[in-house]
Amino acid sequence: MRILLTNDDGIHAPGMAVLERIARALSDDITIVAPNSERSGAGRSLTLTRPLRLRQLGEKRFAVAGTPTDAVMMALARVMKDAPPELILSGVNRGANLGEDVSYSGTVSAAMEGALAGIPSIALSQVYAREGAGLNVSFAAAEAWGAKVLRPLLDAPWAPRSLYNVNFPAREPEQVLGIRVVPQGLRDYGQTEILQRTDPRGFDYYWIKLAGMPSTPAHSTDLEAAADGWVTVTPLHCDMTNHAALAATTALYR
């Protein structure tokens, strides 16, 4: 099985090394095409105003000076054009991609690009505790549980334009409770702040401070399940149509 690996933390990120070890438990045919630097929060953005640079770093290892979506496009249209991947894995992200995170996440967006191309695609992220913030995030749960959560998905039928979002809890492997399939949760991002600072030359600059809190019923979504210590699996699809609203919206124009 040909597997493409990508991410949004950059090709040199620790999570990429973890993902490669997970993937090699499934196949020896691995190709890595990922951004050359961190592109967290890039969503599904494309690079359209400057050329993309592709650099080969080793056998089947390529860095793209672009976004995660750029990297997947480059892999499918150039690097792996003659032998397309049969599976795309994106991650392992340093930090959760839960609830509304998926809308901003370059990790999930890279998997979504694969899904749009008709290729089974899975995003993987490692949640970390607040005290674990920084560069020393433990990927132990992802490494121990990665292949376990992937194998059943590979044997299952895939709906068109669908993908899976997997999050590993901030627990030691032996403390993980198991695997739960849960829907996407909801955070209250109305609490987001814009922090103002002033540089030495007197010019203002700003930081986005994400301060949202979970606001979904307990134990029913990816947010609560991951916090409780479960590996979460959430099926996603690329069709963003609100099908429940179609009839009511149609009636507005009669």
Swiss-Prot record:
Provide an example Pfam family for this protein.
Answer: SurE
Q: What EC number(s) does the entry state? A: 3.1.3.5
Residues binding a divalent metal cation are D8, D9, S40, N93
Where located? Cytoplasm
Q: Give the enzyme class.
A: hydrolase
Task: For this UniProt record, give its keywords in alphabetical order, as a comma-separated list.
Answer: Cytoplasm, Hydrolase, Metal-binding, Nucleotide-binding
Cofactor(s) the protein needs: a divalent metal cation
A GO cellular component entry from the record: cytoplasm
What's the catalysed reaction? a ribonucleoside 5'-phosphate + H2O = a ribonucleoside + phosphate
Q: Which Gene3D superfamilies match?
A: Survival protein SurE-like phosphatase/nucleotidase
| Keyword Hydrolase on entry | yes
- Into which family does the record put it? Belongs to the SurE nucleotidase family.
- What's this protein's name? 5'-nucleotidase SurE
Q: Which organism is it from?
A: Rhizorhabdus wittichii (strain DSM 6014 / CCUG 31198 / JCM 15750 / NBRC 105917 / EY 4224 / RW1) (Sphingomonas wittichii)
Gene field: surE
